[in-house]
Amino acid sequence: MSQNFLAKIDALYQQFQAHDQAHSDRLKRYRNIEPESAELLNVLIRAQQSKRILEIGTSTGYSTLWLAYAAQATLAKITTLEIDAERSELAHQNAVDFSLDRFVEFLVSDAQDYLRKTTEKFDFILLDAERDAYCDYWNYLPQILKEKGGLLVVDNVVSHESEVNDFLNLVRDNPKFSTTILPIGAGLFLVTYN
């Protein structure tokens, strides 16, 4: 892994953390994924050799940068969804600053609208958005996740267990899927077809 990338991404993460600490309103905070979780995403994408990646919940693009860093190696294309236009623009600028923007399509969109309309199949999906919508998203996620080797990763399942418990049970109750929780960062829920 490039020491230059690690130094730049760490500095950016520290800026985002300082922003979050200055805001008590949850919706004003950036709420980026933890570095150890982001590093795992990088490894998973490389191991899987992902070609088509979907990120639901761009925020300011910290996780997007990690996805794009891995996408360089696998020649993947990322579509990332963010409902807040300002955050999406900041994420895009961060990708430009890291020279990773060529791997990412930034869409300002309601995730449920996108999921309902898309006909694409993705071999890697990161779900890190407003948790109260996850059960609704599940109506569409199985149709767009590739059946052979596709992986859905959901963040914050340990730190916000009570908020995602219905979603976790909904997925676990579907016999078509294998799941596990990794106690990394805020907790990652991994989902794949059997």
Residue ranges and their predicted role:
Residues 1-124, 131-153, 157-194:
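A short alpha-helical cap/connector motif
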